[in-house]
Amino acid sequence: METTIAAISTAMSASGIGIIRISGENAMDVISRIYRSKGGKKKIKEVPTHTIHYGYIYDGEELIDEVLVMIMHAPRTFTGEDTVEIDCHGGVYAMQRVLDTVLKNGAEIAEPGEFTKRAFLNGRMDLSQAEAVMDVIQAKNEYALRSSMDQLRGSVQKAIRDIREKLIYHIAYIESALDDPEPVSYTHLRAH
């Protein structure tokens, strides 16, 4: 994907923590423009993948919020792209200011479901797993959550793969029976 997207990933209501997610080829450039470590010396673009860093988000010289920033380099991310998650204070205004600063520095607002769409397009999940993400979010009871999590872990894909293997076996068996004039035992076919 050519664009870098961002969105608030938590509910837009007052809470202890709010999460802003950035994903795309310029995610590291965006965060490097707005993040400063506590000592001001750490260059966020140079840190290892899958690490968390304490610091501040600035809009120019204006301090916006105290944050934790998680850096995740492609391809081992949800979307398969470079990804940054900013954990800021969960006030509605604080989250919006951090998001606005991210957008002002090179990201575009994500459409609903766009992170999952990118994960699908980048081969990080199949269609049934992409659908399961929304099912997990909307689960209202234990059964719904468990079922959705099974689907997210690939249970539908595994079932389809098993059926496909059986079909291939049966087709090969039938084709060999058609090629060979000797009688074929269909009890062997039923056993599979």
Give names to the regions the model predicted.
Residues 187-192:
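Conserved small/polar residues in nucleotide/adenosyl-binding loops
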Residues 180-184:
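Flexible helix-coil linker/loop segments in the cytosolic histidine kinase module
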Residues 1-146, 150, 154:
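A glycine-rich (often HGG/GG-containing) alpha/beta subdomain
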Residues 124-128, 163-177:
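Core structural elements
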Residues 152, 156-163, 167:
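Amphipathic alpha-helical coiled-coil segments
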